Amino acid sequence: MEGPPLEVLKSSSPVKHSTFWLFMGLAVLVGLLTGGLVLYLHRRKRHIPTDDPIKALEPDKKLSVSNSNTIFLFGDFQIFDRDGADITKLFTPLLKELFLLLLVNSVKNGRGLYAEKLDEILWFGRSEQSVRNNRSVNMAKLKSILESIEHCQLLKEAGYWKLEFDYDFWYVDYHSYLDLIQAKEKLDEQHIRLLFELAQRGNFLSNHNYEWLDQFKAEISNEVIDVFLIYAHSAKAHNPEFLIQIANFVFNFDQVSEEAMIIKCRALSSLGKHSLAKKAFDVFIKDYRLIYNEDFNKNFNEII
């Protein structure tokens, strides 16, 4: 009676064995195909610009996790190579201005700066021969520095000099700033905090006073204030302590910003800190009087 079952077991064993290896082979094949697809999409994604600039920034991470391949333009100008070494000292005063002039314009408009405009800014009043010699020498020096740091090129295209960075390898705070600022109406608290972190290093190129830079500085100051105030007035702003930080930051750019004062006083009041709110108002009206030589036209109760 036990004979037939044994025969069944004996005959079914190789079937199960081959089926097992068939499924294993299919699993490996699916895994390889899936891995290849993920890798392809990842590489493709890195080279296709997103339609939503704020999606390019991860809100749960700091803007720069290390100084490797990093350029800071907010606060003091600093540039770090791939090993995190500060190479700012390699730039002489003229090379620094040349680099910053090309960098700011390249990041801002993607084209760089027209050659004749570059000559006019840096070597105005010199003979054509002198300009040509100075440009040639300093461009060669700049190229030499850039060749040592990789993933950055000095190019001339259609009469424009420009710097081209591979942002997969480089962090440039001004580039990240522009990504954020383009979507100012859509920013949530996480992205506002990224902008806050970025700008906390200081005003844009704060220790540099080139005449050509004034326009950029004014534009950035106005944009930062506008973005923070737009957010502070939006329905997304519900953290009074963060609103106080925003107001204080705006005061760094405009110490008599009425909007910042109102935001700060109301946020302090909502936290039950009424005496601090009144003190903030008193400081504001004192500064207002000193700057405009007239009294502010509202009292504390009107703005709360």
Annotate the PLM regions.
Residues 21-263, 269-304:
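Intrinsically disordered, low-complexity protein-interaction/activation regions
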Residues 1-14:
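Membrane-proximal extracellular "stem/stalk" segments
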Residues 11-23:
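Short, low-complexity patches enriched in S/T/P/G
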